[in-house]
Structure formats: C-alpha cells, structure tokens
Amino acid sequence: MNTYLGDKVAIVTAKPQTTRNQISGILSEPSAQVIFVDTPGVHQLRGKMNRMLVQSAWQAMHGADLVLVVLDGDAYLRHPDILDRDLEPLLRAVAQETRPVAVALNKVDLFHDKSRILPLLQQLHEAWPNAEIFPVSALTGEGLPPLLNFIKARLPEAPAQFPEDQLSTVPLRFMAAEIIREKLFISLKQELPYYTAVGIEDWTEDAASGLTPIHAVIHAGRANHQGMALGPAGQQRNGIEHAAQIC
C-alpha cells in the first residue's frame, strides 16, 4: 500500500503482528480511486489481544469489494507448510469467496533463482483456484502494476469518495503515534514491543518554522519494561526519538 501511495501511511517492521488497527490508504488516479484497508494479519496465535486483531481483520474483509491477501514470499519459501499450519482459517475463507480475490506473493526480489517461485505459485493456485496470483516486490515495485490493474478492473463504478490529494482517513496524531510505535518495534528486542503503546499528549503546529513539536508518551506493560525501553542513560529512548523525527 505504501508503495502504491508513494508515502508512508501504514507502518512496517520485520516483526509479526506489527499492525494493530485498520489503516486506510487512498490512491487517486484519473481513471479510478482505490481505497486500500491494511489490516492486522490473520493468524492462529492465542491470547485476547491476538483474537481482537484477527477479528478486526475479518471485519475489514467483510466490507471490501475485493480481497487482497499479501503473503511473505521469503517466509513461505522457508516454511512451505505455512498455509496449512498458520493460515488455515484464511485458506478456507478465501476458497469460499465469491468476490474477486488477488494473492500477492511479496518479497520476490529476494529470490535470486526465480525458478524457485514456480512451486510456490503452483501451490497457491491449488489452494485458491478462485484467486489471481501475483508475484510482487513492495520494495522494488516488481509486479505491482499488473496487480493494480487487476484491482482497478474489478472495482464497482462509483463517484470518488475522497479528494484526490487525500492519502488516508487516519488522523495525523494517530499516524505520528504509529510511526513512534514502528521505531519501538525496530529498536526493542524480543517480545518487549508487544507490551508497549504510544499516546500523543501534545501537538503544537508552528507555522513559522513549519515544524510540529510533539509530546508523546510510551506506555509500558510492566514496570521493568520502562527501564528497558529507556536504555542506559536514556540512550534507547533518544535513538527512537531521532528515528521517528527523520521518518
């Protein structure tokens, strides 16, 4: 979604379950307006929060005109049983879909031997015969134009819902908090990022400088997590602050 929009709307990290909320991205072109909804990943991990994340993903899917499943091609190559093991509910739901379905096998830029993609594509075709499969790279843009053409060709005809310069329905305050949370996920180790949340307490726009000073609070799930998030002499916190500022 970020690649299509040419801007950061949804945060991205290598850690699973980074996305906690439905994030909209609006792509406006002369011939079409596409509203993407990025959702939490569908998985079978236990726990109340994980169940809430998956429920949010299902709710977003029910309201869409088209279903786009994005798979990590690199992880899929290393664990070919991922469909049966982790994505069984999604496998069943998509197989029963009557709406258009596209499956994007992402990160194909990591496949130096492109012939290794073919068995994966065959497995996906067998699992989802009702879907169009697209090998893509969100990093390099490889394969993205055909996928977008597929999406636009199957959207219902309707007037544009948003101004052409609007990229999302997400408030800027929320987006700022998400960017800080992204840096937490990147900087903090192991499970610690999953026990943190970010709130924006002060937002002051300075028209003269063009800058917006932000006072953000990082909430830690446990008392000992606070020190770990700060780091020695606050070095960890300073690094996260700097990374968020230059984003």
Residues covered by each model-derived region:
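Amphipathic helical hotspot of TIR/SEFIR-family domains
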Residues: H79-A95, I200-T204
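Conserved ATPase-coupling elements of RecA-like P-loop NTPase cores
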Residues: L45-M49, L53, Y76-L87, H112-I117
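Canonical P-loop GTPase G-domain recognition
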Residues: A95, R99-A102, D109-F174
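Conserved G1/Walker A P-loop phosphate-binding module
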Residues: M1-L71, T212-A220
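Structural beta-sheet core signal
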Residues: V69, V103-L105
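Conserved, well-folded catalytic cores of nucleic-acid-processing
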Residues: T3, D7, I26-P30, A60-V67, ...
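P-loop NTP-binding site
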Residues: L172-C247
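Conserved nucleotide-binding/hydrolysis micro-motifs of P-loop NTPases
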Residues: P16-T18, P40-H43, G73-L77, V108-F111, ...
